[in-house]
Structure formats: structure tokens, C-alpha cells
């Protein structure tokens, strides 16, 4: 029988996103993993469609993720991304780089996540770029909305 502490460590996490402004990201912990919740701007959402040819798995066909995240934004609500913040290469934590065209990532960078350990890049839907060490998209954890401003991570039924 698992201890109360062990049960709590695996329990779903309820998050209030009422103060999460467009363009912002917050971090929460679920099952000992960092989970990012990103409120994407209209421009960021529009840019996602421009990246398909640069991505390894733009339609998330090769990924294990909830069925409701198998769309262009990989989200229940298009503007809100919920993703596990662990690189699918060797488990480092990528940095949030929403800026467009920074010198170190190139003029064609439209915002996303960059893993400083080995250079893997992911777009703002957590989809991995071609030609980087990471073999697959960032994980989308099970989650559901309890209201417009409350998300439950770790449970989707």
C-alpha cells in the first residue's frame, strides 16, 4: 500500500490560470516533473502553422499524448499549452524562448523552447524541430479544465 506522501506525489495538481497573461508561462510540479502552462498570443498561434516543414512530427503522429492534444496547437484550448518541461533527448529542461529572431537562434526562430544541453528546439506547441537530438515532441500530460480559469493536471476524465 503506498504511503500518503507517495499518493500525494502522484496526485493531480489544480492550477489557477486567471492571472496568466497572453505571452506568459508559469511552472508547476506534477509527479516530480516540471509542467509548463503557456498562454500563447494570437501571433504565436498564427506562427505555428508556418513551421510544419521544419518540424519532425508536426501532426504529433508519433507521440503518446491525450487524443485531445492531437491537433495543430496540441491543446484543449488553442491559446493554452500544457506540457511537461523535460527535453525528450536526455531529460534536461529547455528554456522558454518566446522572442522572435534572437541572434543565438537565428532570424527564422518564431519562438519556442530551446534545450541548452544539446541544442534541441521545440516550437510553442512543444513540437520538435528536424535535425536536433530530441527524437519526439514534448509530452502533453493528461489534464482537463475545471472552469475557464482552473486546470487540473494529471487527470482528464
Model-found features: residue ranges?
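General structural signal for secondary-structure boundaries
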Residues: 11, 22, 41-42, 144-147
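A structural detector for beta-sheet-dominated domains
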Residues: 16-18, 29, 146, 154
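Extracytoplasmic/periplasmic/luminal assembly and interaction segments
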Residues: 19-72
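Solvent-exposed coil/turn segments that connect beta secondary-structure elements
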Residues: 31-33, 40-42, 118, 148, ...
Amino acid at each position: 500500500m503506498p504511503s500518503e506522501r507517495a499518493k500525494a506525489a502522484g496526485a493531480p495538481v489544480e492550477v489557477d490560470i486567471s492571472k496568466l497573461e497572453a505571452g506568459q508561462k508559469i511552472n508547476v510540479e506534477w509527479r516530480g516533473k516540471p509542467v509548463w502552462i503557456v498562454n500563447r498570443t494570437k501571433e504565436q498561434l498564427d506562427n505555428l502553422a508556418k513551421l510544419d516543414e521544419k518540424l519532425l512530427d508536426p501532426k504529433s503522429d508519433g507521440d503518446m499524448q491525450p487524443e485531445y492534444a492531437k491537433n495543430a496547437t496540441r491543446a484543449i484550448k488553442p491559446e493554452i499549452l500544457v506540457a511537461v518541461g523535460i527535453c525528450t533527448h536526455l531529460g534536461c529542461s529547455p528554456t522558454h524562448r518566446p522572442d522572435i529572431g534572437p541572434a543565438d537562434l537565428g532570424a527564422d526562430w518564431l519562438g519556442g523552447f530551446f534545450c541548452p544541453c544539446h541544442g534541441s528546439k521545440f516550437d510553442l506547441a512543444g513540437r520538435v524541430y528536424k535535425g536536433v537530438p530530441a527524437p519526439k515532441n514534448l509530452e502533453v500530460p493528461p489534464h482537463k479544465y475545471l472552469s475557464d480559469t482552473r486546470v487540473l493536471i494529471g487527470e482528464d476524465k
